[in-house]
């Protein structure tokens, strides 16, 4: 257990959050924390439960920052990137983001992750099937 987790375990607020997570009361949320504070709390939750985390952030920049912070505390943190937006017709488009997303899904299927971080933009992304119909 890291020293950060040891300190958080003494907190009543963290104990309440951990209890909610343990009893299956999901989703679990915490407000009022700094970006680094969020990473520390998520890391402590992971250390307590040893279950992979799915973390939603308000935007892509927050997702990238939180992923970097979590990676310094624990390994195998995945960032599920948003789709690349193309507003003009182009002759050739890069499939880099599609490949990155497929890599994350592949690693999730293999169980090779401790947390997946994604932004809320994924919830509002239309699917290709919805666009076709």
Indicate where each model-derived feature is located.
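Short, ordered, surface-exposed loop/turn motifs in non-cytosolic proteins
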Residues: 130-133
């Amino acid at each position: 257990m890291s020293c950060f987790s040891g300190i958080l375990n003494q907190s009543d607020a963290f104990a309440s959050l951990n209890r909610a997570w343990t009893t299956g009361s999901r989703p679990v949320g915490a407000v009022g924390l700094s970006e680094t504070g969020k990473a520390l709390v998520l890391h402590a939750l992971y250390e307590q439960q040893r279950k992979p985390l799915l973390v939603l952030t308000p935007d892509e920049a927050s997702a990238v920052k939180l992923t970097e912070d979590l990676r310094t505390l624990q390994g195998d943190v995945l960032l599920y990137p948003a789709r690349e937006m193309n507003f003009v017709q182009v002759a050739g488009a890069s499939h880099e983001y599609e490949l990155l997303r497929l890599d994350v899904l592949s690693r999730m299927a293999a169980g090779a992750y401790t947390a997946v971080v994604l932004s809320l933009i994924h919830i509002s992304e239309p699917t290709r099937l919805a666009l076709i119909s």
